[in-house]
């Protein structure tokens, strides 16, 4: 029971031949990367606006004398994890976990001297949240011979100046390239093209595609929703079909997003979903989280650590938060599930 002929164009890692309405950003990136000296770039914009696609497409078109290294900072969210990934990418060898950070740094520096290298730090917000700017500081210090360029991809940071210390920023001096949210018309165009490549002919009604495009600006979520629906029906997809699958598709999207994180991330998210009225104060979330931990035989984390995990959920776009200062209780954070997933 499926309307899918070709899975690939609906997968999140698929890189199309052309990227909808991102020509100016593509040209800006390509022009920067064609410089004699590799630049440092901050590519920023909301989730699902083509940042990763742009980067993945362009690194395949680099000159032959430039080696590129792609690091997903969701999976490599500390300096040591990112350095291990970088060392493996440079050398083609497995990197033992026992390597000390300083030893990894020395081995990497030796390799970087020989040819030009471009390092992509995708989802860099997770690295900055967990580990501050230690990796960027290290990379900025070995960037002197201009053999190294860095692309920092961020969904939440429009300017690194507020995220990293002054000496690191002054050395990096990244060029800023931003992507704006897609309009519903642009989302429609993207989903329509992917559906044409993936689904059986006449299996998606026009009004269904219009509804899907208007319901989300995040193309990743839209593609997941379309894929989930097409895989679980044998009838042409109507607007009503999408409404029926919306809750389950969003649930699966969240599960997939959190699959690379800990049980505590999933437990925390479940605790946030337990309430009927939002927003909810962080103190109420902590209490409900501990109750879930007892039921699951998990040792609860400290409030400080849970505060970090709340930021992880926010970085993924799964929740929205607002912090208030002052008043009887001092600093208060209010939390609610993302409006995109309602």
Enumerate the predicted regions with their spans.
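Short amphipathic alpha-helical interface segments
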Residues: 263-291
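Walker A/P-loop nucleotide-binding motif
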Residues: 37-57
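A short hydrophobic beta-strand->loop->alpha-helix junction that borders the nucleotide-binding pocket
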Residues: 45-47, 68-78
